[in-house]
C-alpha cells in the first residue's frame, strides 16, 4: 500500500498498539527549555523516577533570557527562578544543558537543527508549540504539554493518535523579494488558522523544493498557525548537504547508511492524502498581516479588507474586532501604516540567512526617526557567524540594535516587549492580541520587509526600495 511521508515515519515509531487503543510511539529527540519543564521534573522527583534517556534529551534557555545581558537576573524574578530551576533539574537528572554562556545556547528550534540533533525520519518533541520547525528535515516534530514532557522524560514514549494527512503544494517559482515567510503566510491566508486542524501537513512542489533548509524551517515552523499538528518536507540532497559534518549528525559509514535510509522517506506515488491544496508560487507577493491572527494577512499592495467582505459570520466578527484592536480601517493602504518598532528574530526568522536578508536591506540606509529596531540572532552560533560576516556592523551603522540570542520580542516573557498602542513589524509567528506586550499591535512580515519598514518608518514593498 502506498504511504505518505508522515505515515512512514509514524509507523516506524509505533512500539505498542492494543486493539482499540491509542498507539504508543517512541520519541527519538526530546528538547527542553526553562518554561515548560519545571513541573515535569518535579513530577519525576515526586514519583522517584529518573530521566530514561539522558542521551536523547537536551536543554537550553531561550524564552526568558535577556538579550542585553548574560546576567541570569536581568529579565526579572520569575525568569531567574525558571532558569535556575532548569540548571538544578538538568544537573540533578544528568541532562545536557546549553546555558547562557554555552556556545550552543539559543532558541531551541534554531539550536537543534544547527548542531545536527534534527535528523530525517526521527520523532522530535518539545514543550513548545513551534516544534514543527524540525519537520523541515522530514522529521515528525510537534509540541507537547508539560504532563507529556514528564511522560517522555520518564518513558521516552508518548501516546499519539494517527493524524489525517494534508498535502500543500506550491508550484512554480516565486519572484524576487518573495521569501519563505511570504509563502507560509500566503498559505495560512488560504487555509485560515483552523484549516489544518487534525492534520499533519506535507509541504511540497517546485517552490518548496527550491528553498534552502533555513527557508524550509520557516515554512514548517508556522504549520501550527494553520492549525496543523505538524508540518513536514521530505529530505533531499539539500537536507543532506546541510546536515553533513554537524556535531550530532552521523559520521563515516553511519552517515552513508543514514542517507540511504533517509532517501526512502518520501511519499509514495499513488499515496492518498485526506486533503490537498495547491498554490501558484509566482502569484505570491510580500505578505503583511493586518489583524490579530496569522490568517488575517494580505499582500503589501492589497487594501485592508472590510468585515463585510467575509461571508462567514465568525470571520466577519473577527475582522471587525481585529480592525478595532489594530486601530486600522477597511480600505486603508498598508503603506500608510506607520510603525514604532521592528523585530527581526525568533524561531521563525532568527537564522543566518534571515540576518543576511535584513542586513542587505539596511546597508547604506538609516532606521527612520522614532523607530526602535531590534535584530536578535536565534543562537550563539548565528550570532558568531553574523559577526564574522560583519553583518552586525552593517546593522548597527544603520541604527538597528544588535542583541544577544533569545526568543526576545516574539512573546512578552522577557524585557523585550511592546507598550500599549505600539505597532511592530515582526518576523515572528503570532500576532495575537497582547502577544508582544499588553495592547501591542503586531504585523507579521519577512526579515527583509521588517528591515524595510524600520528604514522607511512604515510598511513598504521591499521590491520597490
Curated annotation (Swiss-Prot):
Alphabetical keyword list: 4Fe-4S, Amino-acid biosynthesis, Branched-chain amino acid biosynthesis, Iron, Iron-sulfur, Leucine biosynthesis, Lyase, Metal-binding
Signal sequence bounds: none
UniProt cofactor note: Binds 1 [4Fe-4S] cluster per subunit.
Class in the EC hierarchy, top level: lyase
Keyword Magnesium: no
Pathway: Amino-acid biosynthesis; L-leucine biosynthesis; L-leucine from 3-methyl-2-oxobutanoate: step 2/4
Positions of [4Fe-4S] cluster binding: 347, 407, 410
HAMAP family per the UniProt record, alphabetical: LeuC_type1 (MF_01026)
UniProt protein name: 3-isopropylmalate dehydratase large subunit
Gene: leuC
Amino acid at each position: 500500500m502506498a504511504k505518505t511521508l508522515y505515515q512512514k515515519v509514524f509507523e516506524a515509531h509505533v512500539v505498542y498498539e492494543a486493539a482499540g487503543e491509542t498507539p504508543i510511539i517512541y520519541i527519538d529527540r526530546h528538547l527542553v527549555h526553562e518554561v515548560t519543564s519545571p513541573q515535569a521534573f518535579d513530577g519525576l522527583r515526586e514519583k522517584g523516577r529518573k530521566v530514561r534517556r539522558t542521551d536523547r534529551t537536551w536543554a537550553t534557555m531561550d524564552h526568558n533570557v535577556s538579550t542585553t545581558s548574560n546576567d541570569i537576573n536581568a529579565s526579572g524574578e520569575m525568569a531567574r527562578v525558571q532558569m535556575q530551576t532548569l540548571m538544578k533539574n538538568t544537573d540533578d537528572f544528568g541532562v545536557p544543558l546549553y546555558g547562557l554562556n554555552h556556545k550552543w545556547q539559543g532558541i531551541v528550534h534554531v539550536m537543534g537543527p544547527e548542531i545536527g540533533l534534527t535528523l530525517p525520519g526521527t520523532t522530535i518533541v518539545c514543550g513548545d508549540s513551534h516544534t514543527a520547525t524540525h519537520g523541515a528535515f522530514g522529521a515528525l516534530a510537534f509540541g507537547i504539554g508539560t504532563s507529556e514532557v514528564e511522560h517522555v522524560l520518564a518513558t521516552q514514549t508518548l501516546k499519539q493518535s494517527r493524524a489525517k494527512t494534508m498535502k500543500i503544494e506550491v508550484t512554480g517559482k516565486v519572484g524576487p523579494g518573495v521569501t519563505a515567510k511570504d509563502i507560509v503566510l500566503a498559505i495560512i491566508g488560504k487555509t485560515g488558522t483552523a484549516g489544518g486542524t487534525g492534520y499533519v501537513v506535507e509541504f511540497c512542489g517546485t517552490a518548496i523544493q527550491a528553498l534552502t533548509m533555513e527557508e524550509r524551517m520557516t515554512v514548517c515552523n508556522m504549520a501550527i498557525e494553520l492549525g496543523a499538528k505538524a508540518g513536514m518536507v521530505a529530505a533531499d540532497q539539500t537536507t543532506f548537504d546541510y546536515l553533513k559534518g554537524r556535531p550530532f549528525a552521523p559520521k563515516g559509514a553511519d552517515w552513508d547508511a543514514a542517507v540511504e535510509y533517509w532517501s526512502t522517506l518520501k511519499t509514495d506515488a499513488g499515496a492518498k492524502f485526506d486533503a490537498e491544496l495547491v498554490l501558484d508560487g509566482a502569484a505570491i507577493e510580500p505578505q503583511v498581516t493586518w489583524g490579530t491572527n496569522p490568517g488575517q494577512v494580505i499582500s503589501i499592495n492589497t487594501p485592508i479588507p472590510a468585515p463585510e467582505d467575509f461571508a462567514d459570520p465568525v470571520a466577519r466578527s473577527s475582522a471587525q474586532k481585529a480592525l478595532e484592536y489594530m486601530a486600522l480601517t477597511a480600505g486603508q493602504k498598508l503603506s500608510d501604516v506607520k510603525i514604532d518598532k521592528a523585530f527581526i528574530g525568533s524561531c521563525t526568522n532568527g537564522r543566518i540567512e534571515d540576518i543576511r536578508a535584513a542586513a542587505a536591506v539596511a546597508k547604506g540606509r538609516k532606521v527612520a526617526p522614532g523607530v526602535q529596531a531590534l535584530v536578535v540572532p536565534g543562537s550563539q552560533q548565528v550570532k558568531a557567524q553574523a559577526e564574522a560576516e560583519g553583518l552586525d556592523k552593517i546593522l548597527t551603522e544603520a541604527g538597528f540594535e544588535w542583541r544577544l540570542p533569545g526568543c526576545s520580542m516574539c512573546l512578552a516573557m522577557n524585557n523585550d516587549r511592546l507598550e500599549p498602542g505600539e505597532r511592530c513589524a515582526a518576523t515572528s509567528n503570532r500576532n495575537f492580541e497582547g502577544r508582544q506586550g499588553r495592547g501591542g499591535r503586531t504585523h507579521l512580515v519577512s526579515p527583509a520587509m521588517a528591515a524595510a519598514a524600520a528604514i522607511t518608518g512604515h510598511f513598504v514593498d521591499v521590491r520597490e526600495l
